[in-house]
Amino acid sequence: MSDKGELMEEIMEAKVMWYPDSKKITQMDQFRNRVNRNLGLRLANYNELYQWSVEFYPEFWAEFWDFSGIVYSKTYDEVIDRSKGIADVPEWFKGSRLNYAENLLKHKENDKIALYSAREGKENIEKVTFAELRRDVALFAAAMRKMGIKTGDRVAGYLPNCIQTVEAMLAAASIGAIWSATSPDFGVNGVLDRFSQIQPKLILSVESVIYNGKEHCHLEKLQHVVKGLPDLKKVVVIPYVLPKEKIDISKIPNSMFLDEFLATGKVGDQSPQLEFEQLPFNHPLYIMYSSGTTGAPKCMVHSAGGTLIKHLTEHILHGSTTSSDVIMYYTTAGWMMWNWLITAVATGASLVLYDGSPLVPSLNVLWDLVDRLGITILGTGAKWLAVLEDKGLKPCNTHSLQTLHTILSTGSPLKPQSYEYVYKHIKSNVLLGSVSGGTDIIACFMGQNVSVPVYKGEIQARHLGMAIEAWNEEGEAVLGESGELVCLKPLPSQPTHFWNDENGSKYQKAYFAKFPGVWAHGDYCKINPKTGGIVMLGRSDGTLNPNGVRFGSSEIYNIVEAFVEVSDSLCVPQYNKDGDERVILFLKMADKFEFSKELLKRIKDAIRVALSARHVPALILETKDIPYTISGKKVEVAVKQVIAGKEVPHRGAFSNPQSLDLYRNIPELQNF
């Protein structure tokens, strides 16, 4: 049998792990019935609804605008100009006026818990009701306005995943300021590579965090970050681990503690009123960052309306999320899954914020939270599930998990054996939804779906409105074969533009260079023609993504090549048969210097301090040469192919093609 035949046979034998309850009317069913009624259609199932949603995408988004109950002060004149394609970055819902924060804070069940906040090593769980959340956001916003923050200004968070982070973001959004965040595990270089491009007026941070049983002081890093941001007007420090009295911020210019900052927003003893600037649908909400593969990270600007409506399709339709849900996603505040999670509060659901290691003080820390708080939807990383499996953990024997109906996974492809592990040792009737998308769209192209079965090893379905295909190198759609993940039609949550990209050339190069007019996402995938499910096959570019921590090789180069001992370096991913990724760093030594354990330690320490522990390569090896193109570009992708045992046929583009042979059959890279 041919390889292709074996592949197709394997696809046809996909194993069902979960079936939707045919007796349960989901919000997806309600939406499909509404579309049929309003438009005189007879869409019988999810596949027919999906096909309609991508063919008639303006009608789909218009129907969902009404179905979702989006709050607006002025409705739209036009959903989208149909004559414009995805590469034209068309404006959505032209003429409408709304506010993202107003949509998240619209629920009037004042005493209902909006946010829970749990932290590593802390027994007490903080709680904030919807009424308290509105009050706190109003106070944050008043203080921001008092210091001069206005529509379009940038507000930055160098913060953990906690209540104050959510409140500060919503306050910025209520004004029309643009929020941008990195997590505390980023080093000074990593933060300045991002924030120096957008020049925030205000930065909020904490004095220290707890991770993996250790306290990590944050103030020295913050001090260096502040020095690198000349346009910064104010620094607000939130006491997080230590009480205010034990924190010295005297060395940080223009700094004050949170309570002092919020006090400036009060008028006498009165709490300020919550005000929402009414802004165009395309008004900027977030600046997110690319990994920085080819230089400084690209700054992706995401709109308030686009982020809101795309996230709501995923929460309301694909997840059937309601106000009775309690949702937790294990994420930092700098990862797009945080932004995705926070939008869910618009459904009236309660959110659980967790800061710390998911494995400390015990491997059961997240399962303990599920039972303690009645979590219904738990989001995590594929690697975490694999670790629990390797450790032999069986939560079904130790925990009730009665409330849990959905487990979501992202960050890296979910291995087929992880499906078996979840259904055998965690919960047999849970929806296991592997999701995939990216920072580029601040959302998912595909993922969980309450209307279709879960098949082992597959993402359930392409999301509504997402015209996704797998294309071969000739630009032809393929089924049952690996191909480049592409998107053919506009979507509301694609970036409106890149910051500091006036003519849009960086934007066009990032997504449309490979297939003109078609979004190429940089992932390889395979679409099952029988089930409609998708198997992700890893990155197709030079981005590094070990354990779901996405970053670019240039971030490593900037640090390593500052060492006098190193003349050049190359950083590439290596994949094992299960799709797990690790980072390999090759060093070319400068003349008269030797490769040594002492040098390795200093390099690892430097990467850990400047970026984070999660950026440290799994292996650092010596090499005698590094391949370059004739035009002088370092060639990572070719080395990635060689260490995977593949041939590099087009050697004519290399200035030193013989260097590729140095990376073949390296002993340290075998048996991964």
UniProtKB/Swiss-Prot annotation:
Its biological purpose is as follows:
Activates acetoacetate to acetoacetyl-CoA.
Reactions that this protein is recorded to catalyse: acetoacetate + ATP + CoA = acetoacetyl-CoA + AMP + diphosphate
The family assignment reads: Belongs to the ATP-dependent AMP-binding enzyme family.
Report the source organism. Answer: Xenopus tropicalis
Q: What is this protein called?
A: Acetoacetyl-CoA synthetase
An annotated GO cellular component of this protein is: cytosol
Q: Which UniProt keywords apply?
A: ATP-binding, Cytoplasm, Fatty acid metabolism, Ligase, Lipid metabolism, Nucleotide-binding
- Give the PANTHER family listed for this entry: ACETOACETYL-COA SYNTHETASE
Localization per Swiss-Prot or TrEMBL? Cytoplasm, Cytosol
Q: What is its EC number?
A: 6.2.1.16
Q: Say which domain of life the source belongs to.
A: Eukaryota
Q: Which GO terms describe its biological process?
A: fatty acid metabolic process
Coiled coil located at which positions?
A: none
GO molecular function per UniProt: acetoacetate-CoA ligase activity; ATP binding
Under InterPro entries, the record lists: Acac_CoA_synth (IPR005914), ACAS_N (IPR032387), AMP-bd_C_sf (IPR045851), AMP-binding_CS (IPR020845), AMP-dep_synth/lig_dom (IPR000873), ANL_N_sf (IPR042099)
NCBIfam families on file:
ac_ac_CoA_syn (TIGR01217), PRK03584.1 (NF002937)
